[in-house]
């Protein structure tokens, strides 16, 4: 970079400041510019804070109901998706047996039973609720609650 004298430096500084401040004012004074975005974000945060204050409940039974509904929805989704996958695998296996090739013998199965679900719900209901500075959603998870699905019975895949 060339060495500039003070006068040349000043003119470049002046024109760059004038150019940047002109665009800054044009952007910020526009209703859709930066100030408009900040107003929208402030309004959104206010609406979300009002909504979360109405939703929060200090009743541990309602939190337990939410957990139960969430787990039952997740389990039913898991059962239905694995059932559909198993049906697909059986259809592909039947098609392969007609052609005397084994494509997929089995996708996997759920080795747990409904008793396992009851045991999980029992452990969740026994879990302790925290009473810290965050009232409402302060639930501490127990370390001994863990649900792992490991598909087994995976057959050979041949192409």
Curated annotation (Swiss-Prot):
Enzyme class: translocase
GO process terms (BP): ATP biosynthetic process; proton transmembrane transport
Stored Pfam families: YMF19 (PF02326), YMF19_C (PF06449)
The reaction(s) this protein catalyses: ATP + H2O + 4 H(+)(in) = ADP + phosphate + 5 H(+)(out)
Top-level lineage group: Eukaryota
Membrane topology according to the record: Single-pass membrane protein
EC number: 7.1.2.2
Segments traversing the membrane: 10-28
PANTHER family cross-referenced by the UniProt entry: ATP SYNTHASE PROTEIN YMF19
Family classification: Belongs to the ATPase protein YMF19 family.
Name of the protein in question: Putative ATP synthase protein YMF19
Natural source organism: Helianthus annuus (Common sunflower)
Gene: YMF19
């Amino acid at each position: 970079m060339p060495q500039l004298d003070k006068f040349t430096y000043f003119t470049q500084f002046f024109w760059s400041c004038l150019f940047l401040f002109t665009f800054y004012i044009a952007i910020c004074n526009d209703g859709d510019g930066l100030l408009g975005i900040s107003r929208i974000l402030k309004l959104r945060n206010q609406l979300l804070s009002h909504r979360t204050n109405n939703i929060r409940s200090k009743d541990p039974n309602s939190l337990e109901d939410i957990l139960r509904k969430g787990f039952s929805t997740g389990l039913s989704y898991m059962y239905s998706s694995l059932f559909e996958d198993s049906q697909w695998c059986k259809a592909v296996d039947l098609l392969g047996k007609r052609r005397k090739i084994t494509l997929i013998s089995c996708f996997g199965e759920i080795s747990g039973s409904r008793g396992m679900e009851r045991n999980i719900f029992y452990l969740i209901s026994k879990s302790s609720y925290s009473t810290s500075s965050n009232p409402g959603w302060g639930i501490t998870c127990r370390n001994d609650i863990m649900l792992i699905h490991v598909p087994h019975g995976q057959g050979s895949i041949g192409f």
